[in-house]
Swiss-Prot record:
Gene (UniProt): ykoM
DNA-binding region, residue range(s): 60-83
Entry annotated with the keyword DNA-binding: yes
Pfam family, one: MarR
SUPFAM superfamilies the UniProt entry points to: Winged helix' DNA-binding domain (SSF46785)
Record protein name field: Uncharacterized HTH-type transcriptional regulator YkoM
């Protein structure tokens, strides 16, 4: 059963947690934003390239859901990256309704150069936490995200 009421202390703790989380997210995100701008991409374009580089070819719908983008934004970003030669779209031979995006040789070569530096900058951003603390934070953030997502559909 879903809780419908919270006492004042619980509400204040939740609001404090939200503010701390939002500030931390913004601070860490700035590292990625700086990297994307440094290489001539907007943050969404950089996120798409990073996803394809680290996870391989993706259905366009998967890109949207993984990066929390609406389909129009996905199409716009994919179009731009394709025009610039970083990725291509291909129809799934097994399901003609599905279209995959994958990096071109140019895209892979470019990410081979810039991704290691980007990953080190993100690692540095989290280096204030021990490896155990980072693992704990991953578990807690996943738990909070799943619970929050579940509440949206009640």
């Amino acid at each position: 059963m879903m809780r419908l009421s919270f006492n004042e202390e619980e509400v204040e703790r939740a609001m404090n947690l939200y503010r701390v989380f939002a500030r931390a997210f913004k601070s860490v995100s700035e590292h990625s934003i700086r990297d994307s701008k440094e290489h001539g991409f907007n943050p969404t374009e950089f996120a798409v390239l990073e996803l394809l580089y680290t996870r391989g070819p993706q259905k366009l719908q998967q890109i949207g859901s993984r990066l929390l983008l609406v389909s129009g934004n996905v199409t716009y970003v994919i179009d731009k990256l394709e025009r610039n030669g970083f990725l291509v779209r291909e129809q799934d031979p097994k399901d003609k309704r599905s279209v995959y995006a994958h990096l071109t040789d140019k895209g892979n070569e470019y990410l081979d150069k810039i991704y290691p530096i980007h990953a080190l900058r993100i690692a540095r951003a989290f280096s204030g936490l021990s490896p155990d603390e980072q693992d704990q934070l991953i578990v807690l953030l996943k738990k909070a995200g799943i619970h929050s997502q579940h509440l949206l559909f009640r």
